[in-house]
Amino acid sequence: MFNFEKFWQHFNDEMRARFNEVAYNAWFKNTKPISYNQKTHELKIQVQNPVAKGYWEKNLSSQLIQSAYGYAGVELLPVFQISEDSDTPERIVTPEPQHNLQTTPTRAPQREFAKDLKLNEKYTFDNFVQGEGNKLAAGAALAVADSPGSFYNPLFIFGGVGLGKTHLMQAIGHQMLVERPNAKVVYIQSETFVNDFINSIKNKTQDKFREKYRTCDLLLVDDIQFFAKKEGIQEEFFHTFETLYNDQKQIVMTSDRLPTEIPDLSERLVSRFTWGLQVEITPPDLETRIAILRRKAEAEGLTIDDDTLDYIASQVDTNIRELEGALVKVQAYATIEKADIDINLAREALVDLKLVQKNRGLQIPKIQEVVANYFQTSTAELKGKKRVRQIVIPRQIAMYLSRELTDASLPKIGQEFGGKDHTTVMHAYDKIDKQMKTDADIKTAVFDLKQMLEH
């Protein structure tokens, strides 16, 4: 009898040896078999999101079938389904059906273009920290890197400033050059495309301009929203897009918003941008911010304890760029003061940050008291272990507010709530943070309580 659970472990071990950590986590970490039919050999597999489902069906199902046959002589029939409790803050737009466009022979690659690349050597998949806010985008980027021109084309990554869009885009470029050193990869800011086009008209070098942009294997365009209201540029980019797409060359774009939200973007460009996949990156949650700081500290050779990393992460909740900037500021302050980096030094270094301007007189017991009164329960219940909803929600909100309105570390907050582990506090914080975006009652309660505690 075929033991699908043992086989799944065997297959995971095979794939772990093949994939790097980022790719393995993207495709296997939250994927699991849920049932197996001994008669039909149908194996139902649960995946986390539509991107993972598409990648498994296109790229991994054949390997799974081959592995099962080699392992036990079983002709496996994998069926993939998306987890019903999948909870992701990113928006994802399902690709429209691909158009049957004629293809032309592949042009010979030109290595000389690679010399002009301005890819940041640090922007690789290995250096990318995955979290709840970027896992869909990371998965899509990995899929594109594995199958350029065929999986999600174009790939459109959107989100706020400093969230990792450029990192993921350039990681695709690095991956292509690793696997195909002679590939022609062009990475540009949208302003570069605009300037190159204008200069080509002035200098009558349109042929060279089109040779540069229409004969590449991978075109990476950052901040595509700057094409807004530029009709001539949009016309030229439309023809560039058409040529590359018809040649099955990969196009990746980033923007601070969806194509439909870019003002005065032509309808035909909006339409073509939606042929592939549009996926959002949202601000990193607390756990991801801590992981980013830890990796950055290791790269800089800094020794920083977990409580201090936790404190720094709690002070910057906007984007990765500002988060890393806060760490640089702490490092510089430690150098000037000739002192080791600890939580007290971090507090002094970051005192002018907005989030540090918290009510230092506010204590966790006061928060517990106000929350308990608001929800008509007791502080003892908030500190207790009851798991009924009437207690769990107020307890999690109290932990969230303790995190938001005081300087207390995660372990300290956990201690104030009956000795709970810091991971429990982190889970509570992230859960309330997410629910505030979808649950009006939770959002109102948190707003009311903040008003009561801050005034």
From Swiss-Prot:
> Per the UniProt entry, what is one GO biological process?
DNA replication initiation
Task: Specify the protein name.
Answer: Chromosomal replication initiator protein DnaA
Compartments reported by the entry: Cytoplasm
Q: Show the HAMAP family listed in the entry.
A: DnaA_bact (MF_00377)
One Pfam match, given by its short name, reads Bac_DnaA
Chain segments carrying region Domain I, interacts with DnaA modulators: 1-74
Tell me which family the UniProt entry assigns to this protein: Belongs to the DnaA family.
Can you name the source organism? Lactobacillus acidophilus (strain ATCC 700396 / NCK56 / N2 / NCFM)
PROSITE patterns, alphabetically?
DNAA
Subunit record text: Oligomerizes as a right-handed, spiral filament on DNA at oriC.
| Region feature Domain III, AAA+ region, mapped onto this chain | 118-334
Provide the alphabetized UniProt keywords: ATP-binding, Cytoplasm, DNA replication, DNA-binding, Lipid-binding, Nucleotide-binding
Q: What does this protein do?
A: Plays an essential role in the initiation and regulation of chromosomal replication. ATP-DnaA binds to the origin of replication (oriC) to initiate formation of the DNA replication initiation complex once per cell cycle. Binds the DnaA box (a 9 base pair repeat at the origin) and separates the double-stranded (ds)DNA. Forms a right-handed helical filament on oriC DNA; dsDNA binds to the exterior of the filament while single-stranded (ss)DNA is stabiized in the filament's interior.
Cross-referenced SMART domains: AAA, Bac_DnaA_C
The record's listing under SUPFAM superfamilies reads:
P-loop containing nucleoside triphosphate hydrolases, TrpR-like
- For the region Domain II, what residue ranges are annotated? 74-117
